[in-house]
Amino acid sequence: MKLSILICSLEKRKEQLAELLAEINLQITSCDASAIVEVIIEVDNKQITTGAKRNNLLNKAFGKYICFIDDDDHIYPNYIKLILEAIESDADCISTTGIYTVDNGRKVRWKLSKDYQDENKYSEEFNQIVYFRRANHLTPVKRELALQAMFPDQSNAEDKEYSFRLNPFLKTEVEIKELVYHYDYRSYDKEYH
């Protein structure tokens, strides 16, 4: 198994999860990757913390690489194909670029990399403010390194703490330059995964 895609969800988000799974399955089929990509989902009704759910998923994964997709976000049509191509480099992690919106409003580009600190700054490359973030749960990373970092047993900012724990283990990286992910923060939905 090359890649484990891990998704935390809530019972009340069945429709959003179904849309995401349809897109993931379409991409797996179009890449002829069903033998090398697994999708593992953990759905509950907030019985355990998001961090505990993420750790359960990490422990169930068999892929050499793992990445999380939030059930209320969107992936671009080339997401899986580009990650599978990048995996061939055998780097510790894969730097990615995406779009961040609040309530599907103004689009802001973000970039994830082991080489960044968490900061927002102007990028001449994109002629706009870009959210530069260290590698986090959305970053495809070798599973063995994610297992060393693990998530704290909490539902708020567990991804940020995981990022701080993970980054010291990351020595090598390959970059996907194309947009692959759309993170849409919903100000009206305070439910955690």
Predicted regions and their residues:
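Acidic donor-binding loop at a coil-to-helix junction in glycosyltransferase catalytic cores
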Residues: N156-Y162
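Short, well-formed alpha-helical segments that are part of the catalytic scaffolds
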Residues: I7-T29
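Glycine-rich, basic loop-to-helix element that forms the pyrophosphate-binding segment
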Residues: N45-A61
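The conserved acidic donor/metal-binding loop of glycosyltransferases
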Residues: D70-H74
